[in-house]
Amino acid sequence: SIRERWYRVPSIWVPDAFFLRRNNLYPKFVLNQCDAVSTDTMHRIKFHDGIEPERAILSYYNSISFAFTELCGRSYGGGVLEVLPGEMGEILVPKLDSVPMERVRELLKQVDLIIRNNGDIEEALDLVDAQILVAELGFEPDVCADIRCIWKKLQRRRLNRG
């Protein structure tokens, strides 16, 4: 049915983070440090108790999670990648419990600077793949490189459809 007060936003609350619903070159998961609100153009994320927001955000920025986002999401005209709430739950992210919090914050700050300065997202993925997947979690560098190739192939396929 049509809302009686169509001009009112139906649900306003301050989330811990936002995951952009529709993306161009790569998906974006951002910490909400300024108590911003949003309509449903972005997924509003509220972390469970015991989940450290910085760990959650950093755990997303790697080749594995980007490849799974392309696999789980859907592609629309112009090469847009859309990720729905149910699809978000299918994206694999590494568990970073063993990574010291100072290191998490340091890496997240570097990723943030790359993104804010419109740098190449692959610089951020290189950093997190090397520092987290390889150095902390024991992935072989060749495996990370193969997974990056998978993400790039899926990304190119999506972008070329537009």
Regions found by a protein language model. Give the residues of each.
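Polybasic, glycine- and aromatic-enriched phosphate-binding surface used to engage nucleic acids
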Residues: 1-113
